[in-house]
């Protein structure tokens, strides 16, 4: 099977973009890349902001790309922990929203603010995304996921 980038030659209207946020653990950097015909890239250079990324962010992104094999190997670990969250949260009495991302939205939370604060007191930071009776947890390492699930099991829903 072909990758999208292999379809580029001879297709001047095809653009392939990819965010580096999840696979490269760069969520806060807001960085990605675009593959396209050189004429399209030249046209985009004319309209982009002059200082769209800091030098530090650019250097970090280049370092990540140079070590893509190592960085992308982490994706499978993240998927495993996400799938573990999807599997184990219902056993604790929560509903889960199916996810292909690096996080899981779970519901059935009686008081999201209180649970958020209880978890925070255990040094666990999750997100209250403003959906009633729901919270969002990011898939972490195996140890982080275990700690989250074990702690959550001891707290009131």
Task: Mark where each language-model region is.
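Conserved PLP-binding catalytic core of the aspartate aminotransferase-like
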Residues: 78-79, 83-122, 135, 139
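Short, conserved loop/helix-junction motifs that constitute active-site signature segments
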Residues: 7-11
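PLP-dependent enzyme catalytic core of the Aspartate aminotransferase-like
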Residues: 117-121, 127-157
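PLP-dependent aminotransferase class I/II
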Residues: 13-90, 94-97
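Conserved PLP phosphate-binding loop immediately N-terminal to the Schiff-base lysine helix
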Residues: 1-5, 24
């Amino acid at each position: 099977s072909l990758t999208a980038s292999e379809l580029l030659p001879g297709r001047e209207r095809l653009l392939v973009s990819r965010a580096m946020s999840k696979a490269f653990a760069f969520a806060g950097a807001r960085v990605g890349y675009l593959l396209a015909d050189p004429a399209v890239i030249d046209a985009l250079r004319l309209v982009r902001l002059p200082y769209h990324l800091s030098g530090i962010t650019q250097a970090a992104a280049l370092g990540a790309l140079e070590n893509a094999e190592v960085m992308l190997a982490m994706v499978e670990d993240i998927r495993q922990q996400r799938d573990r969250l999807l599997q184990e949260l219902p056993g604790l009495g929560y509903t889960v929203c199916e996810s292909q991302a690096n996080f899981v939205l779970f519901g059935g939370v009686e008081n999201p603010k209180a649970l958020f604060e209880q978890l925070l007191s255990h040094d666990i930071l999750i997100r209250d995304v403003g959906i009633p009776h729901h919270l969002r947890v990011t898939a972490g390492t195996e140890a982080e996921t275990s700690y989250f699930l074990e702690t959550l099991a001891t707290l009131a829903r």
